[in-house]
């Protein structure tokens, strides 16, 4: 009896079973309910795995809802006032999720185009490669990207990477409303059947165009399971070296972008400690507007609801808690694909159909031809070396002039060299000719030449390397000509002061007697330009990328 009471107590503690939202309905009930569950169009839609674009073509027929016995499946939608809706025969395990959306911004940070493509493909929940020959074997020091390598967001990042050195910060908000998957052996769409019928039985160079035409229409894969809802995803491209010159890091800016996004959706108050810390950082760095207005090289994606990607709910003009709430309220009736599982198209064909293997080969060939290769044998610029952790990354020795990302730590930095000194018509002694030497000054440094004895027209072959200097604030470049006597009583014959500018310059200065000519060259450090190297200069990729093996390069 005690054991019975114990088990009964456990049973009473268990949560009540949730009734299944779907049931088998009679023909008359099926006719009375005309609306499908939201988002049925997503099931069985074609997808090109290299672009992650949905094809708007459907290899699977999701319009059929009556079974052969004239029954159907109807579902009670708790997110739409328990309305009764049809479920297509091709769909199984349909479930609505909670009616509320958690207001939380997830942030990811990557430093390469490959990383952006990898994050874009992270919404695929299964191994899309299964059954395909798509495992590239690159040479040493070559990185390969396949899934998402030609997606809009990856193309955006690649374009940026060819312009400058970037870090990429992504802020994302997701809401899941429904989930379902395809039934086993779903019915094929009549148009897809017709397209398959027109395919040649074998895949080779002469039939490739026919298979490419089908892939162009339907994609490489089809959606087999899906989470529906909404997503707002904003990728901000941050110029690494420009941030360094502003006294900031990509992590600092990314953290404050996330805080501003949290405030815009009502997930965090503008009186929070994090928000106040970012406001203080803005004051320190003289940022007059918000971080998202200051750093606004962005790619925006809005899925679900009545909005499109021109409506940035995190950083745009409509970025308010009220607009975000309105968008959430629209998702039960207008959901979009948040994440999904994929299978290659060829598995829809019967095992005995020879076109199944031909289509498998065609998809494999197409996907591999679209792979993007990054050749990490590309040389680093002078003064840089390959990172021990990533052979595709060039790094520098951390110093008071540059950081490990090879970014100058402040504006105005240049490498200064002075050489080719020639004096004429000097007069330093009454009896003999001049015993001349030079003193050259800049930025607190002094460099001397040796003495040229008994010569009123001396020249010096010294190459004076002042190293990295602050061109704008180092003071004048000063060249003094002296006549050597006993050291303590040497005579100053004249001084030449010039405010140095970037570039190659020949200088001719008059002295008390005669003149002095010399050359100086001031080369702005990488990422800097202008007369005194105060302006920012983007640094694109060095040279043309090497040819790739089977697809495009980054």
Swiss-Prot record:
Location relative to the cell: Cytolytic granule; Secreted; Cell membrane; Endosome lumen
Residues the entry annotates as binding Ca(2+) 1: 428-429, 483, 485, 491
Transmembrane stretches, start-end: 128-148, 256-278
Binding locations of Ca(2+) 2: 429, 432, 435, 454
Domain MACPF: 26-374
Binding site for Ca(2+) 3: 429, 435, 483-485
A GO BP annotation: circadian rhythm
Short name of one Pfam family: C2
Glycan attachment sites: 204, 400, 548
Family annotation (InterPro entries): C2_dom (IPR000008), C2_domain_sf (IPR035892), MACPF (IPR020864), MACPF_CS (IPR020863), Perforin-1_C2 (IPR037300), Perforin-1_pore-forming (IPR052784)
Site (Important for oligomerization): 213, 343
PTM statement from Swiss-Prot or TrEMBL: N-glycosylated.
Residue sites binding Ca(2+) 4 per the record: 485, 489, 491
Cited PROSITE patterns: C2, MACPF_1, MACPF_2
Signal peptide bounds: 1-20
GO molecular function: calcium ion binding; identical protein binding; pore-forming activity; wide pore channel activity
Assembly description: Monomer, as soluble protein. Homooligomer; homooligomerizes to form a pore-forming ring.
UniProt name for this protein: Perforin-1
Protein's organism: Rattus norvegicus (Rat)
Lineage: Eukaryota, Metazoa, Chordata, Craniata, Vertebrata
């Amino acid at each position: 009896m005690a054991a019975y009471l114990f088990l009964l107590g456990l049973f009473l503690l268990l949560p009540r079973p949730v009734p299944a939202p779907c049931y088998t309905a009679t023909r008359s009930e099926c006719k009375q309910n005309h609306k499908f569950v939201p988002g049925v169009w997503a099931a069985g839609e074609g997808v090109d795995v290299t672009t992650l674009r949905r094809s708007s073509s459907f290899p699977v027929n999701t319009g059929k809802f009556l079974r052969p016995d004239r029954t159907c499946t109807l579902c009670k939608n708790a997110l739409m006032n328990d309305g009764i809706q049809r479920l297509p025969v091709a769909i199984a395990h349909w479930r609505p999720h909670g009616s509320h959306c958690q207001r939380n911004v997830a942030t990811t940070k990557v430093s390469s185009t490959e990383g952006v493509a990898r994050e874009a493909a992270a919404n695929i929940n299964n191994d899309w490669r299964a059954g395909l020959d798509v495992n590239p074997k690159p040479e040493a020091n070559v990185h390969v990207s396949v899934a998402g390598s030609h997606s809009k967001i990856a193309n955006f990042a690649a374009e940026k990477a060819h312009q400058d050195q970037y870090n990429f910060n992504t802020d994302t908000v997701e809401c899941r409303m429904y989930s379902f998957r395809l039934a086993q052996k779903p019915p094929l769409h009549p148009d897809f059947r017709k397209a398959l019928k027109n395919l040649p039985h074998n895949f080779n160079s002469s039939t490739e165009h026919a298979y490419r035409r089908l892939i162009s229409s339907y994609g490489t894969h089809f959606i087999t399971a899906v989470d529906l809802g909404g997503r707002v995803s904003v990728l901000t491209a941050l110029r690494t070296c420009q941030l360094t010159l502003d006294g900031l890091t990509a992590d600092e800016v990314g953290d404050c972008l996330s805080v501003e996004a949290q405030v815009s959706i009502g997930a965090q108050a503008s009186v929070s400690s994090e928000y106040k810390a970012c406001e203080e950082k803005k004051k320190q760095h003289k940022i007059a507007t918000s971080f998202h207005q200051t750093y606004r090289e962005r790619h925006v994606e809005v899925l679900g609801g009545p909005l499109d990607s021109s409506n940035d709910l995190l950083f745009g003009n409509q970025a308010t808690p009220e607009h975000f709430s309105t968008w959430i309220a629209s998702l039960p009736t207008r959901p979009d694909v948040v994440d999904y599982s994929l299978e290659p198209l060829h598995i829809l064909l019967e095992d005995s159909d020879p076109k199944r293997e031909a289509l498998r080969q065609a998809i494999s060939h197409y996907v591999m031809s679209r792979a993007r290769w990054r050749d990490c044998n590309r040389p680093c610029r002078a003064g840089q070396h390959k990172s021990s952790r990533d052979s595709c990354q060039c790094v520098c020795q951390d110093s008071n002039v540059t950081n490990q990302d090879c970014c100058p730590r402040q504006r105005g930095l240049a490498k200064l060299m002075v050489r080719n000194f020639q004096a004429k018509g000097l007069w330093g002694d009454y009896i003999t000719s001049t015993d001349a030497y030079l003193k050259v000054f800049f930025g607190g440094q002094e460099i001397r030449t040796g003495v040229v004895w008994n010569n009123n027209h001396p020249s010096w072959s010294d190459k004076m390397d002042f190293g990295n200097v602050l061109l704008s604030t180092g003071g004048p470049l000063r060249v003094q000509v002296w006549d050597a006597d006993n050291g303590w009583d040497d005579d100053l014959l004249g001084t030449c002061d010039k405010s140095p500018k970037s570039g190659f310059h020949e200088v001719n200065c008059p002295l008390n007697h005669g003149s002095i000519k010399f050359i100086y060259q001031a080369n702005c450090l990488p990422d800097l330009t202008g007369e005194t190297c105060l302006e920012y200069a983007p640094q694109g990729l060095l040279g043309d990328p090497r040819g790739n093996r089977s697809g495009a390069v980054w």
